[in-house]
Regions:
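Hydrophobic alpha-helical transmembrane segments of ABC transporter permease domains
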Residues: 10, 21, 25, 33, ...
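Transmembrane helix-loop-helix hairpins at lipid-water interfaces of multipass membrane proteins
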Residues: 10, 16-73, 77, 150-155, ...
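An intracellular "coupling" helix at the cytosolic face of ABC transporter transmembrane type-1 domains
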Residues: 11-13, 99-103, 119-132, 136, ...
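Alpha-helical transmembrane segments of multi-pass membrane proteins
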Residues: 15-16, 63-82, 133-140, 161-188, ...
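Juxtamembrane helix-loop junctions of ABC transporter transmembrane domains
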Residues: 21-22, 29-42, 63-110, 114, ...
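Short intracellular "coupling" helices and adjacent cytoplasmic loop segments at the cytosolic face
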Residues: 46-48, 83, 91-115, 119-121, ...
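Helix-loop-helix
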Residues: 48-49, 53, 58, 148-162, ...
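ABC-type nucleotide-binding domain
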Residues: 329-580
Length: 580
């Protein structure tokens, strides 16, 4: 995992290395300062000339300034390296998600992916910053201070052998108690993000049912849970500071007590005042470095959850990949399902589709009907290879879809999914998702074919009118027609409408189908519908029942041979007549 994440440093290796170099310089200079301070204290005590004091003091000031410069440079390069590392992480996660198939996406919720690209990346960025700054600084300071303490202090350094283990034990205990609470916080972040995303997406439904108070209470509960767990963890971690202060004061007392006794008993031969002063500073450095190591341990363990979640995305292999020698041309819009069975995961016991054998000639109009859960959408999603079949094969233009270059195949197949989505931007910008090089004339023609031109021109800015995120400022029927126009701009060999005229009135629906027959006769048109009227003029109607083919034929044939089809048709026709 660490190796994978470290690979995201890439072009920011130099700032990372420079950070480490400057930190080593900063720590080295800081550790030398108490050594020279001891000389200054002894010089003042001995009453040497002022020039010697100024010389030693000047050296201390120079060392402090150099240490400051090294610290500033380390901070600058660390900030640059960590920001670049986070940028690369976000880029790699987003790029990986773009390569995912529907099968991959099904394993992660959208709220979880958002959390991984935001909160988790920030946590990992902070961990990286701590590693290249504090995780290097703290052990170095601990090591240098211990060495200098034993070099200078002699017997006084023995106090470290007592204080250090006590502090270390306390810090480890605090860390182990805090970590479970931090882990619980990150698990609950996803739930809160899901609540936020759900509420924002369904804001109109929430207001329509006057559920604002319920949603506020639900969000408040999720937020309170995070606050409670975070407070619990922070309360435990807060014990670090008083423990550190306690050990520091004990160390000061021991050093001063033992040092003063040694000075009195030896007449300053074993140790002097300057050395005691230095030992107090080194003791502070040692204890501070241990506290920093403890904080790093807690923070890194907290971040480990975020790192793990990022690693899961980065190491998720796309379920669909291009073959070694892909076919780069789709000959026509014919489709063949041969012994097709499909289930959404290998572990699933039940097949969503089973034993599908179906041939569709290029240029045909095919209607697909079936009850809720009959896997109509699943069937058509196999054509552009949004999923791979579990058994059997799907061929487009006489070639197995698994042999095509994915981009080539999907450019030949336009799918208007059941859940229509428009992006923030102008109507033109949205439509050019179908063909970024489409001319204004082609855009207008596609909209006329989709019966969208009239209402688009009624907007104040026409085709330059802005669409809000998700298309919230247009009606459901308008959104569907714009999505159909966008799909038509691809000039596909196969056009799939997955219940994409459900929000359109029957007259407009009929006009759209008439336009298809007149202007794109060579395109294979596959229409999933709830209304038989939307597909009764199709060249072939496919009826699905629980993922299996129930009947195939033309409208009149099915009326005569299939009782279920006839019953649904009569109900819909009778319902329409009663409504009229």
């Amino acid at each position: 995992m660490i190796k994978k994440l470290v690979s995201c440093i890439r072009e920011y290796k130099l700032p990372t290395i420079l950070t480490l170099i400057f930190i080593v310089g900063e720590v080295f200079l800081e550790v030398l300062i108490p050594f020279n301070t001891a000389d200054l204290v002894n010089a003042i005590k001995a009453g040497v000339s002022m020039s010697a004091v100024v010389k030693t003091g000047g050296l201390l000031v120079l060392m402090a300034m150099l240490s400051l410069c090294c610290g500033g440079a380390a901070g600058y390069f660390a900030a640059k390296a960590s920001a670049g590392f986070a940028k690369n992480l976000r880029h790699d996660i987003f790029s990986r998600v773009q390569a995912f198939s529907f099968e991959n996406i099904d394993r992660f919720s959208s709220a979880s992916l958002v959390t991984r690209m935001t909160t988790d990346v920030v946590n990992t960025q902070m961990a990286f910053m701590m590693v290249i700054r504090i995780a290097v600084r703290a052990p170095l300071m601990f090591l240098f201070a211990i060495v200098m303490g034993f070099v200078m202090g002699g017997p006084l350094a023995a106090t470290f052998l007592f204080i250090v283990p006590v502090l270390l034990f306390g810090l480890i205990l605090i860390g182990r108690k805090a970590l479970p609470a931090f882990r619980a916080v990150f698990r609950k972040y996803d739930k809160m993000n899901e609540s936020i995303e759900e509420n924002v997406r369904a804001m109109r439904v929430v207001k329509g049912f006057s559920r604002e108070e319920y949603e506020k209470a639900k969000f408040g509960k999720a937020s309170d849970n995070i606050c409670r767990d975070f407070t619990k963890a922070e309360r435990i971690v807060a014990l670090n500071s008083p423990l550190m202060q306690l050990c520091l004061y004990f160390n000061m007392v021991f050093v001063l007590y033992i040092g003063s006794k040694l000075i009195v008993s030896s007449g300053g031969q074993i140790i002097d005042v300057g050395q005691i002063s230095a030992m107090l500073t080194y003791g502070f450095m040692i204890l501070m470095s241990l506290m920093m190591i403890s904080m790093i341990y807690v923070m890194l363990t907290m971040s480990a959850e975020s790192m793990k979640r990022i690693y899961e995305v980065l190491c998720e292999e796309p379920a669909l990949v291009n073959p070694a020698e892909p076919v780069t041309e789709v000959k026509d819009g014919s489709v063949d399902f041969s012994g097709v069975s499909f289930k959404y995961s290998k572990e699933a016991k039940k097949y969503a589709l089973a034993g599908i054998d179906l041939h569709i000639d290029s240029g045909m109009t095919v209607g697909i009907l079936g009850g809720t859960g009959s896997s109509k959408s699943t069937l058509v999603q196999l054509i552009p290879r949004l999923y791979d079949v579990t058994e059997g094969s799907v061929k487009v233009g006489g070639v197995d879809v698994r042999d095509y270059d994915l981009e080539i195949l999907r450019s030949a197949v336009s799918v208007v999914l059941q859940k229509n989505l428009l992006f923030s931007g102008t109507i033109k910008e949205n439509l050019r998702w179908g063909n970024e090089n489409a001319s204004d004339e082609e855009i207008v023609q596609a909209c006329k074919l989709a019966q969208a031109d009239e209402f688009v021109r009624s907007f104040p800015d026409g085709y330059d009118s802005r669409i809000e995120q998700g298309g919230t400022n247009v009606s459901g029927g308008q959104k569907q027609r714009l999505c159909i126009a966008r799909a038509l701009l691809k000039k596909p060999k196969i056009l799939i409408l997955d219940d994409s005229t459900s929000a359109v009135d029957t007259k407009t629906d009929a006009l759209i189908r008439e336009g298809f027959r007149a202007y794109i006769p060579e395109t294979t048109k596959i229409i999933i519908a709830q209304r038989i009227a939307s597909v009764q003029d199709a060249d072939m109607i496919v009826v699905l029942d629980n993922g299996r083919l129930s009947a195939v034929g033309k409208h009149q044939q099915l009326l005569a041979s299939n009782s279920s089809y006839r019953e649904v048709y009569e109900q819909q026709t009778r319902g329409g007549e009663e409504h009229e």
